[in-house]
């Protein structure tokens, strides 16, 4: 389960960041922000090599002592970043992929809302519920 989920706009500003309430939120803002360099690196590397454009999952961006940071990018260059506790060894790569697909589907639902202006912060109860289902339960 994730300890932080972030949606970052094409222009690299946060549309949505949510972390577990017991953790330091500023630390996760920093972690997500620093991971954007790795995301940009991977996107530019994918552009040079002819890769399947349907593969949106970037995989493990970088591990830290306490966390593992994973990335995903949409066709419109919106980035999803998920921070997972390193001690959770039972979480496999295909489970992370399915969590990102679920997040992407929920993001698509937000974008299809006629009252949502693209580029505005995401304020959707359905999106919040999707993210909550991916988060580590609060103790």
Curated annotation (Swiss-Prot):
One of its GO terms (cellular component) is perinuclear region of cytoplasm. It is found in: Cytoplasm, Perinuclear region; Endoplasmic reticulum; Golgi apparatus. The keyword Endoplasmic reticulum applies. Its main location: cytoplasm. CDD domains: TRAPPC2L (cd14854). Pfam families: Sedlin_N (PF04628). Keywords: Cytoplasm, Endoplasmic reticulum, ER-Golgi transport, Golgi apparatus, Transport. GO terms for biological process: endoplasmic reticulum to Golgi vesicle-mediated transport. May play a role in vesicular transport from endoplasmic reticulum to Golgi. Belongs to the TRAPP small subunits family. Sedlin subfamily. This is Trafficking protein particle complex subunit 2-like protein. It comes from Xenopus tropicalis. The lineage of its organism: Eukaryota, Metazoa, Chordata, Craniata, Vertebrata.
């Amino acid at each position: 389960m994730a300890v932080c989920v972030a949606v970052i706009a094409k222009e690299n500003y946060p549309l949505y960041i949510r972390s577990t309430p017991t953790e330091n939120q500023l630390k996760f803002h920093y972690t997500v922000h620093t991971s954007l360099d790795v995301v940009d690196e991977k996107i530019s590397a994918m552009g040079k090599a002819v890769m399947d454009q349907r593969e949106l999952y970037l995989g493990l961006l970088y591990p830290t002592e306490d966390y593992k940071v994973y990335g995903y990018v949409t066709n419109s260059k919106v980035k999803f970043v998920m921070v997972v506790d390193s001690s959770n060894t039972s979480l496999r790569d295909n489970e992370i992929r399915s969590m990102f697909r679920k997040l992407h589907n929920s993001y698509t639902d937000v974008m299809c809302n006629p009252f949502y202006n693209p580029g505005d912060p995401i304020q959707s109860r359905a999106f919040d519920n999707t993210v909550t289902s991916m988060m580590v339960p609060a103790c």
